[in-house]
Amino acid sequence: MEPFRNIGIIGRLGSTQVLDTIRRLKKFLIDRHLHVILEDTIAEVLPGHGLQTCSRKIMGEICDLVVVVGGDGSMLGAARALARHKVPVLGINRGSLGFLTDIRPDELEAKVGEVLDGQYIVESRFLLDAQVRRGIDSMGQGDALNDVVLHPGKSTRMIEFELYIDGQFVCSQKADGLIVATPTGSTAYALSAGGPIMHPKLDAIVIVPMYPHMLSSRPIVVDGNSELKIVVSPNMQIYPQVSCDGQNHFTCAPGDTVTISKKPQKLRLIHPIDHNYYEICRTKLGWGSRLGGGD
């Protein structure tokens, strides 16, 4: 296992807490005689940092490890940019839930130190590729670590669509939308819509209808290598949107097709050696502790 030498830092803008944590992290890494590289947008609000700066794309090409300081939203954005470069990513939580950024600020030096000493776990998380097509023309493409969501946008009207899996017709449906989520995204929007929690190691995709106008409609878990096709009804009067991780958005027209499949590149997500997925679920989702008051 090669030691990490070139460490990139990405952070969420607009937060003094994030900047304070980045300053601590920078000092800690420099004290360990490591080469530290700042994302250029963060460098602009850290005057006098004296470090090399670059874009996320370049960071993925030159770094051995990238540390993301922020919440899960910050990690989602970084993941889409860095997965293609296979650079491992570590998260320090400065958000709310922190399913992906699981190091607390108060344990920064201890946990990051363990990772630098080779004591860590690496998980591979797959991303989804979403393509919006109008006939043979591509109208938009996006990647998602959590989910791809078809929704009505600013309209309050229901969407009518057909769903196909691996070329086979599944159903037509009227609903407020449809969530297509990875195991990583199963604890995000899909969970709020009544979908199941899927362990990150599962090679599966969950399809969750949003308020379907059909009592028998339920979430479906399919093989992770499935190709999903959503055909927006040509008779609709609204223009629904497709959102990737809630951050990238594309507008569909009636009759458009949304194709969703797994991307070949995977995010390499690093956790501290004592990472416990079920403990995180228990803590973040408020599950009950052991009977008798144990941990």
UniProtKB/Swiss-Prot annotation:
Keywords: ATP-binding, Cytoplasm, Kinase, NAD, NADP, Nucleotide-binding, Transferase. It catalyses: NAD(+) + ATP = ADP + NADP(+) + H(+). One of its GO terms (molecular function) is metal ion binding. It is an enzyme of class 2 (transferase). NAD(+) binds at residues 72-73, 146-147, 157, 174, 176, 187-192, 247. The active site is at 72 (proton acceptor). It is found in: Cytoplasm. Its EC number is 2.7.1.23. Its cofactor is a divalent metal cation. Involved in the regulation of the intracellular balance of NAD and NADP, and is a key enzyme in the biosynthesis of NADP. Catalyzes specifically the phosphorylation on 2'-hydroxyl of the adenosine moiety of NAD to yield NADP. This is NAD kinase. It comes from Pseudomonas aeruginosa (strain ATCC 15692 / DSM 22644 / CIP 104116 / JCM 14847 / LMG 12228 / 1C / PRS 101 / PAO1).
